[in-house]
Amino acid sequence: SLKLLKKYILNLNKSKFNFLYGIFIVTEKKQIHIGNIKIGDINYYHRTAVVSLLIGESKYWKKGIATKSINLVKKIAKNELGLYKLYAGCYKENIASQKAFLKNKYKKEGIQKNQVIFENKRTDLIWYGLVLKK
């Protein structure tokens, strides 16, 4: 429900282990919220975190928005949070997300076979990692 979603976002924004950012299309007349990107599950000892994103409407897919968003949070993770490494998991079928991470210099690190359910079928989760250079 919308109430639970608002509560989730408020709690997330209070956390020092998760940072949620909105992705917007900005025109002269309005801002359109099209998705979110998160730096989450931050481990300050190991200086690592997971990056996850969602662009909801398909008309905004394949326009480079995810690639730009991943690049922005990469800079935040390195320069503001002092993280050493980011990682992200993509469903095997989500080729566009995989390409967006690869364009940002993430490297394929592993596959968890039959890890998740997508469209009522088991599928693989492919993991990508990026060491943030000094």
Segments (PLM) and residue ranges:
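Acyl-donor (CoA/ACP) binding surface of acyl/acetyltransferases
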Residues: L20, T27-K134
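A short helix-loop-beta-strand connector motif used in the catalytic cores of GNAT acetyltransferases and
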Residues: I9-F24
